[in-house]
Amino acid sequence: MKILVTGGLGLIGHNVVQKLVKLQHEVFIIDNSTNYGFIPVKQLSYLISERQKKIPGVFTYQTDLADIESVERIIDNIKPDTIIHLASFPRQKVVNANPVLASTVMSTALLNLLECCKKYSIPRFIYTSSSMVYGDFEDYVTEDAICKPKGQYAIMKLAGEWLIKDYAKFGIGYTILRPSAVYGPLDVEDRVISKFLLTAMRKECLKVNGKNETLDFTYVDDAAEGIVQASLSENTIDKTYNITKSHSTTLYQAALLALNIVGQGEVEVREKDEDFPSRGALDITKAKQDFGFDPKVDVAEGFKIYYEWLKNDPYWQSSLIDKS
């Protein structure tokens, strides 16, 4: 099967591509190698280079998805059976810092892809949304819950879901996936678990915004496996799924776990960031039933795997020395 993965050089994306290649699919990537976040150029370049090493032989189109002519040429040339759309602004604070560019990246790019699916009769479109679309929720939120998005990132993600559902009338079989708090090796520093582990490794104070705020932390390999399973299953057409570990962990618990694994550091608890919704665990019963989704890595194991990678990775070794 020919599969086009947008954002295929991202944290989740390169793991998805690896799995598809192992399954002997013909995979292509569109990625402009930009994070849009608060990431040093040196760090981003290193991470992208390391991700590329894990997917040798997969051709990457360095293209802006907002450029409709370029996107049309690529899709017309490949004629993929499925598009897995992972490219996006990465998280809420990045959207808040540049909402106009975010709209181009998250909305215009999606519309361009859907127009190409319509024009070239692409039968399947997989959209990676976010657990943020639910807004405030407690354990265990199901896919049919009323979405009350909080903030522009969540609103744009939910708008994308509705846009995709509208394009289904053109014969595009869609699948919408909602992951949560994905982490793991080759992630950028500017995420919760990355920050906790690296801050502890630097013997600095971990800052927790809201002691009892919870997240459904999901190890990257589990998230990627769920995305691949959903993308290849006929049972998922025109449906929406939660793709998470389905276990809530408070930020304070996560911080203490990071300290315990690293063996040093301290925690400072601050007020909750009101720009972010209060979230719990997501219910993954539907994904289990429809395509056998079964996340393997719990938070304690995932944190340890990530820490061991950080501890032994040359970039982070030098980074820790520079800041010591």
What is the role of each PLM region?
Residues Y36-F38, G135-F137, P185, L251, ...:
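A short beta-to-alpha transition loop/helix N-cap that caps and shapes the active-site region
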Residues V21, I75, L114, K118, ...:
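A structural alpha-helix within SAM-dependent methyltransferase catalytic domains
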Residues A200-S324:
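C-terminal substrate-binding subdomain of Rossmann-fold SDR/epimerase-dehydratase oxidoreductases
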Residues D67, P185-E189, H247, P295:
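Residue-level signature of the cytosolic catalytic core of signaling kinases
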Residues L11, P90, D187, T249-T250:
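Short alpha-helical
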Residues M1-R178:
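N-terminal Rossmann-like NAD(P)+-binding domain of SDR-like oxidoreductases, especially those catalyzing
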Residues E69, D81, K93, V100, ...:
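Residues in well-ordered alpha-helical elements
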Residues D139, K150-Y153, W162-L215, V220-Q229, ...:
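NAD(P)-dependent short-chain dehydrogenase/reductase
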